[in-house]
Design a protein with these regions (language model features):
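Conserved donor-binding/catalytic core segment of Leloir-type glycosyltransferases
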Residues: 91-107, 113-116
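Aromatic "clamp/platform" in nucleotide-sugar-dependent glycosyltransferases that forms part
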Residues: 180
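Short hydrophobic beta-strand element within catalytic cores of glycosyltransferases
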Residues: 197-207
Length: 278
């Protein structure tokens, strides 16, 4: 018999908020039962799969990774970084907040917008740059206009090539990913590799909370409830109120990536599981 390994990033019920296609869910369930091993991307997903009846004894978690040589702040030219900030009208002495991701409800970007008036009252010299595409594009524009903050929000509803995305990370001061469902969330790893402090959703099935240490000497970011704009605002101000501390968090983030989140580490952990089945 040839062993079968089923790799699972997300599930139909998770992506669709408990709704979705029964046919797809049934196929996922059937494959889980047939497989000798299930590999998923976080311990949060491992527990969620078990909660929905998948056999826990079969499920292993192997984190995703990032290329820290490619995502390296020190390889970005200062003039290229300055061009990004200039493009979005962010002066050198202002703070640039960055969100990158699909513009869909699970990513929490609407909740981030609702957090911004509170942030801007305390830190008016701040701009939020939103990079992504999705069904919430019109809602994002309407929400920022309704909240009276459209002059402090920059949208770019476009696919941005990787090299340019890296420059956006380099140009930012803090990266915010307030997801309410995120099996892993590679954007926070990319930001961490670029030495940026991160504010991440950490309630529910969210892999961010395994990447980001939110207290102690190795802290590299802040955990928030992605469904609560008040909590998101609190998380952002925790970073903005102390630039020196934020720099230290960014350095800690890259150290954590180098230790736990390289693709070599992913390959080694995955190979161990495969070898155990042979």
């Amino acid at each position: 018999k040839i062993p079968v390994v089923f790799h699972v990033h997300s599930t139909e019920w998770g992506r669709a908020g408990g709704q979705g296609s029964e046919v797809v869910s049934d196929l996922e369930w059937a494959m889980a039962n047939k497989a000798d091993k299930v590999i998923t991307v976080s311990y949060a997903m491992q527990q969620d799969l078990a909660k929905h009846g998948w056999p826990l004894s079969k499920i292993s978690a192997v984190w995703n990774g990032v290329d820290p040589e490619r995502y390296n702040q020190r390889k970005c030219k200062k003039e290229d970084i300055a061009k990004i900030r200039e493009k979005y009208g962010v002066p050198e002495d202002w703070s640039m907040l960055l969100f990158i991701g699909r513009l869909t409800w699970v990513k929490g970007v609407r909740n981030l917008l609702q957090a911004m008036p509170s942030v801007l009252r305390e830190y008016p010299n701040t701009k939020l740059v939103i990079l992504g595409m999705g069904e919430q594009q019109n809602d994002i524009v309407e929400t920022s206009e309704r909240l009276g903050i459209k002059d402090k929000i920059v949208y770019r509803f476009d696919f941005v090539p990787e090299d340019e995305r890296i420059l956006h990370y380099a140009a930012s001061d803090v990266c915010i990913f307030p997801s309410v469902y995120e099996p892993f969330g590679i954007v926070s790893l990319e930001a961490m590799s670029m030495e940026k402090p991160v504010v991440v959703g950490a309630r529910g099935v969210v892999g961010f909370k395994e990447q980001v240490i939110s207290s102690g000497p190795e802290q590299n970011g802040v955990h928030v409830n992605g469904e609560d704009p008040v909590d998101i605002a609190w998380g952002i101000t925790q970073v903005l109120q102390n630039p020196e501390k934020a720099r230290n968090w960014g350095e800690n983030g890259r150290k954590r990536v180098l230790e736990y989140f390289t693709w070599r580490k992913v390959a080694e952990e995955t190979a161990k599981i495969y070898e155990a089945l042979l």
